[in-house]
Amino acid sequence: MDPEGFTSGLFRWNPTRALVQAPPPVPPPLQQQPVTPQTAAFGMRLGGLEGLFGPYGIRFYTAAKIAELGFTASTLVGMKDEELEEMMNSLSHIFRWELLVGERYGIKAAVRAERRRLQEEEEEESSRRRHLLLSAAGDSGTHHALDALSQEGLSEEPVQQQDQTDAAGNNGGGGSGYWDAGQGKMKKQQQQRRRKKPMLTSVETDEDVNEGEDDDGMDNGNGGSGLGTERQREHPFIVTEPGEVARGKKNGLDYLFHLYEQCREFLLQVQTIAKDRGEKCPTKVTNQVFRYAKKSGASYINKPKMRHYVHCYALHCLDEEASNALRRAFKERGENVGSWRQACYKPLVNIACRHGWDIDAVFNAHPRLSIWYVPTKLRQLCHLERNNAVAAAAALVGGISCTGSSTSGRGGCGGDDLRF
């Protein structure tokens, strides 16, 4: 059999025919089919899941079953990863529908991508609003004032209202005086914050002298956690005996110790809420507890004040008799609460001495003190007293050895020249 004949018979090539043939007609553009009411209603039944899961390879039947369980795209975006796992497990158990491994990862990836998209939209919207405010302000000086006021948020609203009325009275309703006054007020508040920072962070020395007159002054400023809201000023504390009720616009020490018991109750409530939500449970009184107390209406409980007197409460818990005796003695002498607060350190240092200078162990061993952090000054005083005790013991041992050497006639430390 001739192979050449087979190939020539199979492939017939006619170049002239290829030139004569006309090109195929261009197909008409595809018209997009209108969305029927049935299709729109079906998409609404999915709750936006078709747009959320579309690019991630999740089967349509899986999305439909998730929608049957009552979940929407907004619901899934607000859920945590553990809750998404529970949702997928419920889907498998209820409908006996086995999810693919890629679908499980795809659902989580889609939710994370949607969260990022929403966050970017919020940031763009906020930047756009700020740009509009800046462009509408005018000159450069107004730019700085407006930007600072917008960043401060609600904390500058009373300042704006007050300065607006002042500017309206002084300038006949002009706008330039309003912004200048707002900027000047802001600079004054920033200077006050700078002056308050070293007072709050340094070891309490001079502030305790005037504590009887103005005890809660630093608690009502903006240095605490209450930026943006004005805390109601509380009456100052005075030294009172156990069971004595303070008269006038004063608060006694029994009321102060009662605040610590309230903080303990708020901590228990925060722990219960955190366990129900599956979140990290705090074991000590932290900023989260103070924020919860403020939201619950107990704005008189604030972090600076509670940390300021925590060692006084510790003495009350560890040795109530010594605490009561100290209160009676200072009440008889007419001392203010600042002097009483300073005097509470020494009994605690003595208690730490009996426990090997480990003040942290003393706090953690007590059920009512284990939720509080040890004050830095108390820890420093214990460390200082321990060093002094070690140095005194070493000097005593050295003196005894030197005295023994001089009496035996071997010289050594100089004998009679030492003075103890």
Curated annotation (Swiss-Prot):
Keyword DNA-binding annotated: yes
This protein's name: Protein LEAFY
UniProt feature, compositional bias: Basic residues: 185-198
InterPro entries, sorted: FLO/LFY_C (IPR035209), FLO_LFY (IPR002910), Floricaula/leafy_C_sf (IPR038276), LFY_SAM (IPR035079)
Species of origin: Arabidopsis thaliana (Mouse-ear cress)
Segments for region (Disordered): 153-231
Gene Ontology cellular component annotations, sorted alphabetically: nucleus
Summary of subunit composition and partner proteins: Forms homodimer when associated to DNA. Interacts with SYD and BRM.
Chain intervals with Acidic residues compositional bias: 204-218
Described purpose of this protein according to its UniProt entry: Probable transcription factor that promotes early floral meristem identity in synergy with APETALA1. Is required subsequently for the transition of an inflorescence meristem into a floral meristem, by an immediate upstream regulation of the ABC classes of floral homeotic genes. Activates directly APETALA1, CAULIFLOWER and AGAMOUS, and indirectly APETALA3 and PISTILLATA with the cooperation of UFO.
Designated gene of the protein: LFY
